[in-house]
Amino acid sequence: MLLGVNIDHIAVLRQARMVNDPDLLEAAFIVARHGDQITLHVREDRRHAQDFDLENIIKFCKSPVNLECALNDEILNLALKLKPHRVTLVPEKREELTTEGGLCLNHAKLKQSIEKLHNANIEVSLFINPSLEDIEKSKILKAQFIELHTGHYANLHNALFSNISHTAFALKELNQDKKTLQAQFEKELQNLELCAKKGLELGLKVAAGHGLNYKNVKPVVKIKEICELNIGQSIVARSVFTGLQNAILEMKELIKR
């Protein structure tokens, strides 16, 4: 299984003081040595990663670069110019802390944007909710890759197997008894497996990501149809204590098959 390391949260730390430290390019070099892919989300408001980050990483790093972006003309034109290995199209809301759900596949610009990226020999992935309907639509839209949103799975795992329900970070909608949460968790994991199988049957390559960490990743790794995970915040958080290289290697060990 391949590991794409999302380095957005290193950019978050840099932007907190609006200086050039930590150096995102240095982080990209470490990911290039120890991970399989560099993933970077350039948002419409440029709150974290900047255009020059993407340009430098593509120019100086040998690893594949997976650009996450919304259906924004300015950023899509940047992608067409710089030509990352892959563009993963994601939904985006300015007020959100992180990507909250999968992409709406009925967007009028989506088909045209995919065609433009394909014409530039850029692989296209769609970040989607784990639903059979969205997988079938992704195939019709001629995406090569889908990335299944694992946020709900991760939230359920957190509610079941951590103390988050007793903290300020508890999710009100998951304030339920353990038996109910366990049933929902098992159902969501089964749904991820079903969706991954459907994607592979349709000839799509299947990735997964969002909220995955060192404690919840193992059940997802067992879904053999998933070939790649994109993980960011948990690896960067771990790197504060272990260093980025070790944090990546620890995750690589966990996702070995």
From Swiss-Prot:
Transition state stabilizer, annotated site positions: E147
UniProt-recorded Gene Ontology molecular function terms: pyridoxine 5'-phosphate synthase activity
SUPFAM superfamilies: Pyridoxine 5'-phosphate synthase (SSF63892)
GO cellular component, one term: cytosol
Residues reported to bind 1-deoxy-D-xylulose 5-phosphate: D8, H9, R43, H48, T98
Top-rank EC class of the record's enzyme: transferase
InterPro entries documented for this protein: Aldolase_TIM (IPR013785), PyrdxlP_synth_PdxJ (IPR004569), Pyridoxine-5'_phos_synth (IPR036130)
Coiled coil stretches, renumbered: none
An annotated GO BP: pyridoxine biosynthetic process
PANTHER family for this protein: PYRIDOXINE 5'-PHOSPHATE SYNTHASE
Protein name: Pyridoxine 5'-phosphate synthase
Organism: Campylobacter jejuni (strain RM1221)
